[in-house]
Amino acid sequence: MARYKESACRLCRREGLKLFLKGDRCYGEKCAFERRGYAPGEHGQLRRKQPSDYGVQLREKQKLKRMYGLLEKQFRGYFEKADKKKGITGTNLLLYLERRLDNMVYRLGFANSRNEARQLVRHNHFLVNGRKVNIPSFLVNIGDFIEVTEEGRKNNKIIEAMETIVRRGIPQWLELEQENFKGKVKMLPTREELTMPIQEQLVVELYSK
């Protein structure tokens, strides 16, 4: 599947906030956004123009897409599912994104970023309820167990990521047995538990035009 080829740090600077696309580096002094928080490009340090309502909605969609590393077709597919589902469309959208296997691998601390988690999933390093799953978009459910394979437990990226768990923390809706390389989805998060700086209602308004 096609992916963004632009520098992850440039994406953060363009959106004006940290998207945590480069894992542990985003928490340290080497983070490019900390050193150059203005937009990329020749005129990046100039004052930004006041965006239109459409521009604000578009930027919010771009932030959310890039945070989860999705392209437009797949992202819109999640929105359409969320819109058909009972409940608040924006919250439904966030929950679909959170239920992705690559996101859960990242949330459990088995990878330093969602992009890294996606690669590790594709390389057959994870089991869901005892069965190998190599599809990053696989949707997990409450009660599912996510476990690193025996081979995966020797992978340096997974080992290094798990060493930073204390700094990042594990969400309350997940349970981690660190010594067993195993996690469980205890529940799905409430909107209040998702602390991302996203106004998902703006995304709903954009797609509802």
Swiss-Prot record:
Residues 99-162 form the S4 RNA-binding domain. PANTHER family: 30S 40S RIBOSOMAL PROTEIN, SMALL RIBOSOMAL SUBUNIT PROTEIN US4M. One of the primary rRNA binding proteins, it binds directly to 16S rRNA where it nucleates assembly of the body of the 30S subunit. One of its GO terms (cellular component) is small ribosomal subunit. Part of the 30S ribosomal subunit. Contacts protein S5. The interaction surface between S4 and S5 is involved in control of translational fidelity. InterPro entries: Ribosomal_uS4 (IPR022801), Ribosomal_uS4_bac-type (IPR005709), Ribosomal_uS4_CS (IPR018079), Ribosomal_uS4_N (IPR001912), S4_RNA-bd (IPR002942), S4_RNA-bd_sf (IPR036986). HAMAP family: Ribosomal_uS4_B. SMART domains: Ribosomal_S4, S4. This is Small ribosomal subunit protein uS4. Belongs to the universal ribosomal protein uS4 family. One of its GO terms (biological process) is ribosomal small subunit biogenesis. GO terms for molecular function: rRNA binding; structural constituent of ribosome. The keyword RNA-binding applies. It comes from Syntrophus aciditrophicus (strain SB). Keywords: Ribonucleoprotein, Ribosomal protein, RNA-binding, rRNA-binding.
